[in-house]
From Swiss-Prot:
Superkingdom field: Viruses
Subcellular location as annotated: Virion membrane
GO terms of biological process kind: killing of cells of another organism
Transmembrane segment boundaries: 20-40
Gene: P10
Chief site of localization: virion
Name recorded for this polypeptide: Envelope protein P10
GO cellular component labels: host outer membrane; membrane; viral envelope; virion membrane
Key words, A-Z: Cytolysis, Host cell lysis by virus, Membrane, Transmembrane, Transmembrane helix, Viral envelope protein, Viral release from host cell, Virion
Topology within the bilayer: Single-pass membrane protein
UniProt keyword annotation of Transmembrane helix present: yes
Role, per record: Involved in cell lysis.
Source organism per UniProt: Pseudomonas phage phi6
């Protein structure tokens, strides 16, 4: 579970940011936004 949350914590943790790429962060935020959007529209 920590691996999935690392990109979310990356902007707030330099250690996590060093292990993850901007692309990974973008993908995770896109997925979170998509799921959140679907939940809000129902």
């Amino acid at each position: 579970m920590d691996n999935i949350l690392d990109p979310l914590k990356a902007p707030f943790s330099s250690e996590a940011a060093a292990k993850t790429t901007a692309a990974k962060i973008a993908v995770v935020y896109a997925l979170v936004g998509l799921v959140g959007g679907l939940l809000l529209t129902k």
